[in-house]
From Swiss-Prot:
Phenotype for K72A: Strongly reduced interaction with CASP3
Gene name tied to this protein: TXN
Protein name, entry field: Thioredoxin
Keyword terms, alphabetized: Acetylation, Activator, Allergen, Cytoplasm, Disulfide bond, Electron transport, Nucleus, Redox-active center, S-nitrosylation, Secreted, Transcription, Transcription regulation, Transport, Ubl conjugation
Outcome of substituting C73D: Strongly reduced S-nitrosylation of CASP3
Effect after changing C62S: Retains its reducing activity. Retains interaction with APEX1 and transcription activation
Family membership noted in the UniProt record: Belongs to the thioredoxin family.
Sites bearing N6-succinyllysine, chain numbering: K8, K94
């Protein structure tokens, strides 16, 4: 299941609640074509990797979160463990997304 993040507070709470689990964050926008293309795949990964937390941040709804995380383009995927960023890449690359999850989990 993918949790939609609505605020900076909710983002911080989700990172804190994850504990030792890997957190994958999809920074996207409704108007972004590549974001729409990879969204179903991102959701399918959340079903496949039940031990990983999947979050979705709409950069237009949560500009403060996107800015704090220094997101420059969409989609950007960031990976967190124990509240610290441990990985990041931009672009709708399905293979890289799953490979990065496998590497960090």
């Amino acid at each position: 299941m993918v949790k939609q993040i609505e605020s900076k507070t909710a983002f911080q709470e989700a990172l804190d609640a994850a504990g030792d689990k890997l957190v994958v964050v999809d920074f996207s926008a409704t108007w972004c074509g590549p974001c729409k293309m990879i969204k179903p795949f991102f959701h399918s990964l959340s079903e496949k990797y039940s031990n990983v937390i999947f979050l979705e941040v709409d950069v237009d709804d949560c500009q403060d979160v996107a800015s704090e995380c220094e997101v420059k383009c969409m989609p950007t995927f960031q990976f967190f463990k124990k509240g610290q960023k441990v990985g990041e890449f931009s672009g709708a690359n399905k293979e890289k997304l799953e490979a990065t999850i496998n590497e960090l989990v």
